[in-house]
């Protein structure tokens, strides 16, 4: 990466202070910035086990009297062996073994299971035993597929058999989908359910919670982290009970599969390519000869059932700690590590997963992010020496927006604010950008930590909280987040700062006092902070806007209105800025010794403008297109038939001539990364008439991301990454088209 990342030692939740007992800016240990299957059975969305995981046709054979000759029959064992499960006779004469490999080893030889110390029959272990018995009862070849076919033939209405994933149960209460403080009714597994009807009561301000910071996916666009779902009629794959010895890698091309049964075979390993099956919610590998499982299973963050009963496993990879939605981890029938078994008995699957997560050593840091050069950063004889400067924008994930229940895939020590804030500061200081724009920074952290620490590094800054802070007590105000802008004092002089409060602007617009404006816009307290700066050496001017737009894709109209109001205000501010007297005492090296000059006829559009924004929208969205093209028609679908006076009567239009700094590389692959969402939603816009982008900091290494569930983690302290760009003032103003429109 471009900046160093802390390679902390193995940590535990019992001693978190080791990660944050110092206020030093530098962190120790940092670097400088600078098959086709042999016998496949494809079934139409196997009803396979019921949502509880138990066989739909009982624990014996399905109707038809199939008999599996290699299954040992046990009867009436009322006290299941605490370490290796129990063997109970099944209905219809089917029995099943116990111990490693279902009481079966190579060539079908049956053995007696080893004995171990009794295990307390806690509720967690009772659940474990019930799930083990359900899996052991499915040892016949393609048991689930046959059961599904019989179930389908048993009805006179085949169409009544739902083509759905039987394991697609509601999300576990242990954690959320990684989008903090999201309305769960609007997103499932990160996919939009579409725009709710206008009568949806969830749209009223009283029932909609305060704004979170991470976006939900935009309606009409699939979740970027998952491939579009193919039109496959099946999502379950049953390869169970056919004595497979290995799995072909071709199997893992079926990336839409949600349930994979490879139980009761002779597998000694699972290929690491299983990491391709990102949609898996159930993996049953019961009754094999596995001595290890691949750490890559840890990236299958949608898993709810991982059944590994009756194998030869002695330990589990720490990477399973990121399976934050896992409801059942089946380990009975394995010579498992005593500590892991005890943890599961006492605290259940969630307790064991949390233990693995918090005791995992930090993974290797990613490679440095690489700079991508776009234009040369050189002076020309005609323009003379011109100013170069760098801009960094960063949503730092406010501490109050990062509860452990939301980011349950993140180790507790890495989610701890004291650890995160030190790593955030390290990134900012090492980047050493001339202008730094932060979103989601609360009043307390600005005043007590970031401002004083960055002051030592030569920065000055301004911070404004959201509008709600005005109605709160002093203590409550400290926890309200907002936007902060920092600049290097040796390079810039502050002329003035302004805060733009969107709900207050909405109140002032008498020609737009519609019901939708009151109910949808005025209840959102997003803001923008504008800093008017002057280069100390050349006397040139720079306007920096820093904003955080509303997140919810169901309120795309609100986003448009907020951006429309922001552009109107920026046009007023730049015009006012152009009327300031010109600085005459400048360095003669710059601009061929001439003081900067701004024409009144340009109305401030000849002043370089930077807009750093967490837009909470993809490139190609209405708000992005509006900023980049200068106009949006009033009947645009993203207004969602709501009425906003002249905005919806005649559309939105601005004349600032903006362009995204990363447009030259097709935008970043992502700037926000969680288990259910990965997309670019943070941007730096600029005015190409007055300056050029010389370079941008590239994406995070893809190989690293492929092994990572989401941010924050040990190396990335926020669920966002910073967007970092280098600019150069042109020293001349590109001419406008004949119609005077900078976009046409």
From Swiss-Prot:
Where is it located?
Cytoplasm; Nucleus
Q: Which InterPro entries match?
A: CCR4/nocturin_mRNA_transcr (IPR050410), Endo/exonu/phosph_ase_sf (IPR036691), Endo/exonuclease/phosphatase (IPR005135), Leu-rich_rpt (IPR001611), Leu-rich_rpt_typical-subtyp (IPR003591), LRR_dom_sf (IPR032675)
**Superkingdom:** Eukaryota
Q: Name one GO biological process term.
A: nuclear-transcribed mRNA poly(A) tail shortening
Which parts of the chain are LRR repeats?
Answer: 231-254, 255-277, 279-300, 301-326
- Biased composition regions of type Polar residues, renumbered to the chain: 1-16, 29-43
Leading EC class: hydrolase
Q: Which terms are listed as keywords in the entry? A: Cytoplasm, Exonuclease, Hydrolase, Leucine-rich repeat, Magnesium, Metal-binding, Nuclease, Nucleus, Repeat, RNA-binding, Transcription, Transcription regulation
**Region span, Disordered:** 1-100, 132-238
**Which residues does Mg(2+) bind?**
440
Quote a single Gene Ontology cellular component term.
Answer: CCR4-NOT core complex
Q: List the PANTHER family hit by this protein, alphabetically.
A: CARBON CATABOLITE REPRESSOR PROTEIN 4 (PTHR12121), POLY(A)-SPECIFIC RIBONUCLEASE (PTHR12121:SF100)
Protein family: Belongs to the CCR4/nocturin family.
Q: What's its job?
A: Acts as a catalytic component of the CCR4-NOT core complex, which in the nucleus seems to be a general transcription factor, and in the cytoplasm the major mRNA deadenylase involved in mRNA turnover. Ccr4 has 3'-5' RNase activity with a strong preference for polyadenylated substrates and also low exonuclease activity towards single-stranded DNA.
Q: What is this protein called?
A: CCR4-Not complex 3'-5'-exoribonuclease subunit Ccr4
| Primary gene name | CCR4
């Amino acid at each position: 990466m471009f900046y160093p990342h802390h390679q902390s030692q193995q940590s535990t939740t019992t001693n978190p202070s080791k990660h944050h007992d110092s206020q030093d800016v530098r962190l120790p240990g940092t670097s400088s910035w600078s098959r086709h299957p042999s016998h496949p059975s494809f079934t139409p969305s196997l009803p396979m086990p019921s949502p509880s995981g138990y066989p739909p046709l009982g624990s014996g054979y399905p109707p038809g009297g199939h008999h599996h000759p290699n299954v040992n029959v046990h009867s009436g064992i009322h006290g299941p062996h605490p370490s290796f499960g129990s063997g109970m006779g099944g209905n219809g004469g089917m029995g099943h073994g116990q111990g490693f490999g279902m009481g079966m080893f190579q060539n079908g030889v049956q053995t007696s299971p080893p004995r171990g110390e009794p295990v307390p029959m806690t509720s967690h272990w009772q659940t474990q035993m019930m799930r083990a018995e359900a899996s052991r009862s499915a040892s016949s070849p393609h048991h689930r597929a046959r059961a599904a076919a019989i179930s389908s033939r048993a009805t006179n209405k085949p169409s009544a058999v739902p083509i759905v994933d039987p394991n697609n149960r509601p999300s576990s209460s242990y954690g959320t989908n990684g989008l903090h403080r999201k309305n769960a009714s609007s997103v499932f597994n990160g996919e939009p359910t579409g725009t709710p009807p206008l009568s949806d009561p969830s749209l009223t301000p009283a029932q909609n919670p305060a704004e979170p910071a991470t976006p939900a996916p935009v309606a009409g666009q699939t979740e970027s982290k998952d491939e579009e779902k193919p039109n496959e009629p099946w999502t379950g794959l049953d390869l169970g009970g056919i004595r497979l010895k290995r799995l072909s890698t071709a199997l893992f091309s079926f990336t839409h599969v949600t349930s994979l049964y490879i139980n009761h075979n002779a597998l000694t390993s699972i290929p690491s390519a299983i990491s391709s099956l990102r949609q898996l919610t159930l993996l049953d590998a019961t009754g094999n000869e596995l001595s290890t499982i691949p750490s890559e299973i840890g990236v299958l963050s949608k898993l709810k059932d991982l059944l590994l009963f009756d194998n030869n496993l002695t330990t589990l990879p720490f990477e399973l700690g990121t399976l934050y939605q896992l409801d059942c981890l089946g380990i009975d029938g394995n010579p498992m590590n005593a500590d892991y078994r005890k943890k599961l008995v006492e605290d259940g699957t969630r307790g064991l997963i949390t233990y693995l997560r918090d005791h995992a050593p930090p993974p290797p840091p990613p490679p440095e992010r690489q700079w991508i050069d776009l234009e040369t950063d050189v002076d020309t004889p005609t323009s003379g020496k011109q100013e170069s400067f760098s801009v960094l924008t960063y949503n730092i994930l406010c501490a109050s927006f990062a509860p452990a229940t939301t980011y349950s895939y993140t180790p507790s020590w890495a989610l701890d604010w004291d650890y995160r804030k030190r790593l955030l500061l390290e990134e900012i200081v090492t980047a050493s950008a001339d202008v730094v724009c932060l979103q989601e920074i609360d009043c307390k952290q600005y005043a007590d930590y970031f401002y004083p620490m960055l002051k030592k590094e030569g920065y000055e800054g301004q911070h404004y909280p959201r509008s709600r802070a005005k109605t709160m007590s002093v203590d409550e105000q400290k926890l309200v987040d907002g936007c902060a802008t920092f600049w290097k004092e040796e390079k810039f002089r502050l002329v003035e700062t302004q805060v733009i409060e969107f709900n207050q602007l909405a109140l002032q617009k008498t020609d737009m006092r519609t019901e939708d404006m009151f109910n949808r816009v005025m209840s959102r307290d997003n803001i923008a902070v504008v800093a008017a700066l002057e280069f100390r050496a050349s006397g040139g001017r720079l306007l920096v806007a820093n904003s955080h737009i509303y997140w919810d894709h169901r309120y795309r109209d609100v986003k448009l209105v907020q951006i429309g109001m922001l552009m109107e205000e920026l046009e007023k501010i730049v015009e006012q800025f152009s009327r300031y007297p010109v600085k005459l005492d400048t360095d003669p090296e710059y601009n061929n010794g001439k003081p900067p000059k701004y024409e009144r006829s340009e109305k401030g559009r000849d002043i370089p403008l930077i807009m750093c924004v967490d837009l909470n929208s993809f490139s190609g969205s209405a708000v992005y297109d509006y900023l980049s093209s200068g106009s949006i028609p009033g009947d645009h679908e993203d207004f969602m038939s709501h009425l906003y006076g002249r905005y919806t009567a005649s559309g939105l239009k601005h004349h600032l001539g903006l362009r995204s700094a990363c447009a030259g590389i097709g935008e970043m692959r992502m700037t926000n990364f969680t288990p259910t969402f990965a997309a670019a939603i943070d941007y730096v816009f600029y005015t190409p008439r007055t300056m050029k982008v010389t370079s941008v900091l590239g994406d995070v290494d893809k190989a690293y991301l492929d092994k990572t569930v989401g941010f924050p983690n040990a190396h990335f302290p926020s669920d966002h990454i910073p967007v970092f760009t280098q600019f150069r003032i042109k020293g001349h103003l590109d001419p406008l088209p004949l119609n005077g429109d900078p976009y046409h």
